[in-house]
Regions:
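Carbohydrate-active catalytic/glycan-binding domains of CAZyme proteins
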Residues: 30-268
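Secretory targeting and sorting signals
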Residues: 1-28
Length: 268
């Protein structure tokens, strides 16, 4: 897993616990001149012809300084530092890769009287170190949907995490794969009257997708774990061993993941 030293890593650590609040903010469509790139692909080119990517350029530099200071420079816990205030989102998970910071989030579309979550997709905010200091991000509103898994109901797109895998060749980004560990609701479990939550894993050659089911079935279901199987978080130890943590209110479990040169970290 590749990480970038310096400010982006510190920001990634802090952003992993950041809630993104829903005030309109200056926004313009990204152009070829201002769109950043990763692994040789300009973001606005919609890498690998992903029809779900919608691009918005976010510039909060005109906002009061307390709302656009880099993470960690605000005093007091009550000063806001939102990436965006017009997109209902939470459960941020950060990936520092190739000089860019990606903040993946869920997306809640519930109406005020719904009484629960209505989450069917995931998006991502992207910046680099200059953008981070200037308060400028590019927002990709929908990079993946829960129904990309044929076995899933298309709902329950809660907190997930993306992991970059260099396949043992850190100097060559063309070999890199990205794995997205996400909670979704499993059709079979729901039909059986069980808690429907399961963890799926998708893979892509780009952090923006398109994402496809990596194994064609749930990685974990509640019937296997005996707890609500949500909110996966991946950790790679210093020796290269990967652990997938997950859990629910008051309980957390972890499984040791296998590493395969062909399939990546998709089994345990």
């Amino acid at each position: 897993v590749r990480a970038v030293a310096g400010g982006l890593v510190a920001a990634a650590t802090l952003l992993s616990g950041l809630a993104l609040a829903p005030t309109a903010m200056a926004a313009d469509s990204a152009t070829a001149d201002n769109a950043p790139s990763v692994a040789g692909h300009a973001y606005n080119e919609l890498p690998y012809n992903n029809p779900d990517v919608t691009v918005t350029q976010i510039d909060n530099s005109s906002l009061p300084s307390y709302m656009r200071n880099p993470i960690g420079q605000n005093e007091g816990i009550d000063t806001p530092n939102d990436l965006s205030q017009n997109y209902y989102s939470a459960d941020a998970s950060a990936l520092s890769y190739d000089g860019k910071l990606f903040v993946f989030t869920g997306h809640d579309e519930a109406s005020p009287d719904y009484g629960s979550f209505n989450m069917k997709d995931w998006g991502v905010y992207v910046t680099d170190e200059d953008g981070l200091n200037q308060g400028k991000w590019t927002h990709y509103k929908t990079i993946a949907k829960a129904d990309l898994f044929s076995w899933a109901t298309g709902d329950g797109a809660y907190a997930g995490q993306v992991v970059a895998d260099d396949n043992g060749t850190p100097s060559d980004t063309s070999d890199d794969w990205f794995y997205y560990y996400v909670p979704v609701k499993d059709k079979a479990s729901e039909a059986a009257g069980q808690d429907p939550f399961a963890i799926g894993v998708a893979k892509s050659k780009s952090p923006l997708g398109p994402w496809k089911d990596a194994i064609g079935k749930p990685l974990l279901t509640t019937s296997q774990t005996q707890i609500e199987t949500i909110d996966p978080a991946f950790f790679v130890d210093e020796d290269g061993t990967g652990y997938l943590h997950f859990g629910t209110f008051g309980t957390q479990l972890a499984i040791k993941m296998k590493k395969d040169a062909t399939t990546g970290r998709t089994s345990y």
